From Swiss-Prot:
Keywords: Ribonucleoprotein, Ribosomal protein, RNA-binding, rRNA-binding. One of its GO terms (molecular function) is rRNA binding. Protein S19 forms a complex with S13 that binds strongly to the 16S ribosomal RNA. NCBIfam families: rpsS_bact. The lineage of its organism: Bacteria, Bacillati, Cyanobacteriota, Cyanophyceae, Synechococcales. HAMAP family: Ribosomal_uS19 (MF_00531). Belongs to the universal ribosomal protein uS19 family. This is Small ribosomal subunit protein uS19. GO terms for cellular component: cytoplasm; small ribosomal subunit. It comes from Synechococcus sp. (strain RCC307).
Length: 91
């Protein structure tokens, strides 16, 4: 179930302020954030946002196709090492 239209999309206030300030200045440095639940808005297109995955900040370059998705979708938290080979096969 999605979020109510009357409420609007969730974006962390600190992240929103940083993006608006950089858009006004015309700068595009990397923005560091821990807010994985923030929705990507059209004003964020072209910015690189470093999203925390629990261990490190993963740089995410925001494109037009990402608008409406959450920042956490683009910073995976788990690394898949692969399945182990069957140990019984050698008998």
């Amino acid at each position: 179930m999605g979020r109510s239209l009357k409420k609007g999309p969730f974006v962390a206030d600190s992240l929103l302020r940083k993006v608006e300030k950089l858009n006004a200045a015309g700068e595009k440095p990397v923005i560091k954030t821990w807010s994985r639940a923030s929705t990507i808005l059209p004003m964020m297109i072209g910015h690189t946002i470093a999203v925390h995955n629990g261990k490190a900040h993963v740089p995410v370059f925001v494109t037009e196709q990402m608008v409406g998705h959450k920042l956490g979708e683009f910073a995976p938290t788990r690394t898949f090492k692969g399945h182990i080979k069957d140990k019984k096969g050698g008998r």
